[in-house]
Amino acid sequence: MKRIARFEKVTKEQFCEGYRDCFGEDGDAVYETLTLPRRATAGSAGYDFCTPRALTLAPGETVKIPTGIRVWMEDGWVLKIYPRSGLGFKYRLQLNNTVGIIDSDYYHASNEGHIFVKLTNDSVSYTHLRAHETPEHL
């Protein structure tokens, strides 16, 4: 199988800048624990991104999450970020832009192509996300 893309971590400096912007805290220790997106099984339709820290979202709350991840792709390709089916079905967590679109040239952006995800808890209950796990693992 020909590889057309690869995930990488952004630099520590870039991650810490995004982490401070989102959470108002230092992200040095968190950076060391970042994991690249991976497929849960051989038959998985896509790669799972994990939150770099534990989060609790109140009903109606929105959070912007720095993933610490960038992706190199061949020209002409696109990375699409969809919520796992359980995010909406079980937890009512939704991506704010419905589908995230990462262009192949975003890798070269001034922020190193750092991918951020913005989620909203559209339920009437608090939702807890554990660090380094997808919501399906709760």
Where are these regions (language model features)?
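Non-catalytic terminal segments and appended small domains
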Residues: 1-135
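Conserved AMP-binding A3 loop
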Residues: 138
